[in-house]
């Protein structure tokens, strides 16, 4: 077969093969292009035969070679567009969404257990005549520490690692600053002050099963004439019974807080074993629940309240602590991980 006939045969077979590659055949198309037009392809091999042609025939066949190469090059380009379109269509078909199918049912959210606990506690205090007072999470060092009888050189400041924003501005470590601000504004000629302040507080602590760098407190304050430790105990007994059941009892143990004098730790009788001793109460029959005490005279005096005429008590409890005890939760981190499986248990 002469060279011209071989060129025509190569052109015809290549075009026929190209027309068959109409689907997602990117690799096959590339392989064919290399086999025909590549440096070691069929057309290149045929070009080597030009040297054996006569001087008269060589220009004619050379022109035919160029025409075949140009034709096949254009044919490969056009077929590449067809193959790419087929590839895109195949991808669209594979990823298409049937809009007639019913949608996925929306998952219902649940009120967070801490929200439930906070509202229950607030309702108890509202029923006892307390007012709910909100405060600032970003607070002045003055109100967070100094007004709580913790001057700058007081060693008890080491009890609380603090997130400082500036030397005088911080994230509050307790909700006690609200008590100081409310004391400043209260008009005692209209009666005693009875308030609770719920809110989030922050301490530089390493997160683990029982500690968190942020948590929630509810602190209470009662200031008036002739307020005694007996009033504190009676108030706490009523709160504990409403939260944990009428059969619960409390005990007060001496403690120390800079802003109260005297200060006490409050324990509740174990609600699992009834005071007999178990793993929850560590065989003691009692569970530590909150801290409290009579308001320190210095705290009253700094608000312009005559400590000789007025007295009061304060207490603070943690919402996470209450919720963990009530619901048997053993890891505080569960409150903050946003796991719906955790939240829906308390719906």
UniProtKB/Swiss-Prot annotation:
InterPro entries: aa-tRNA-synth_II (IPR006195), aa-tRNA-synth_II/BPL/LPL (IPR045864), Phe-tRNA-synth_IIc_asu (IPR004529), Phe-tRNA_ligase_II_N (IPR004188), Phe_tRNA_ligase_alpha1_bac (IPR022911), Phenylalanyl-tRNA_Synthase (IPR002319), tRNA-bd_arm (IPR010978). GO terms for molecular function: ATP binding; catalytic activity, acting on a protein; magnesium ion binding; phenylalanine-tRNA ligase activity; transferase activity; tRNA binding. Its cofactor is Mg(2+). GO terms for biological process: phenylalanyl-tRNA aminoacylation. Its EC number is 6.1.1.20. It comes from the Bacteria. It is found in: Cytoplasm. Transmembrane segments: none annotated. It catalyses: tRNA(Phe) + L-phenylalanine + ATP = L-phenylalanyl-tRNA(Phe) + AMP + diphosphate + H(+). Tetramer of two alpha and two beta subunits. This is Phenylalanine--tRNA ligase alpha subunit. It comes from Streptococcus pyogenes serotype M49 (strain NZ131).
């Amino acid at each position: 077969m002469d060279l011209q006939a071989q060129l025509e045969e190569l052109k015809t077979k290549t075009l026929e093969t190209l027309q068959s590659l109409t689907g997602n055949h990117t690799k096959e198309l590339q392989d064919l292009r290399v086999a025909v037009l590549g440096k070691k392809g069929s057309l290149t091999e045929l070009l080597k035969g030009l040297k054996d042609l006569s001087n008269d025939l060589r220009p004619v066949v050379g022109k035919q070679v160029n025409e075949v190469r140009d034709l096949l090059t254009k044919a490969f380009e056009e077929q590449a567009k067809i193959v790419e379109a087929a590839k895109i269509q195949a991808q669209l078909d594979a990823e298409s969404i049937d809009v007639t199918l019913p949608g996925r049912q929306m998952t219902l959210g649940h009120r967070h257990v801490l929200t439930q606990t906070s509202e229950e506690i607030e309702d108890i205090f509202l029923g006892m005549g307390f007012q709910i007072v909100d405060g600032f999470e970003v607070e002045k060092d003055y109100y967070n520490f100094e007004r709580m009888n913790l001057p700058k050189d007081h060693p008890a400041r080491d009890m609380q690692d603090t997130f400082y924003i500036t030397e005088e501005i911080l994230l509050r470590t307790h909700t006690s600053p609200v008590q100081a601000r409310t004391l400043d504004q209260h008009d005692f000629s209209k009666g005693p002050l009875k308030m609770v302040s719920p809110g989030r507080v922050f301490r530089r602590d390493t997160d683990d099963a029982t500690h968190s760098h942020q948590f929630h407190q509810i602190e209470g304050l009662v200031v008036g004439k002739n307020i005694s430790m007996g009033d504190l105990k009676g108030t706490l007994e009523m709160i504990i019974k409403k939260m944990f059941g009428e059969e619960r009892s409390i005990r007060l143990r001496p403690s120390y807080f800079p802003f109260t004098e005297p200060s006490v730790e409050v324990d509740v009788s174990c609600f699992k074993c009834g005071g007999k001793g178990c793993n929850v109460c560590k065989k003691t029959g009692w569970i530590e629940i909150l801290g409290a005490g009579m308001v320190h005279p210095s705290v009253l005096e700094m608000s312009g309240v005559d400590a000789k005429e007025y007295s009061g008590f304060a207490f603070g409890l943690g919402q996470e602590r209450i919720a963990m005890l009530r619901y048997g939760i053993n890891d505080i981190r569960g409150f903050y991980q946003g796991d719906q499986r955790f939240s829906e248990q308390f719906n």
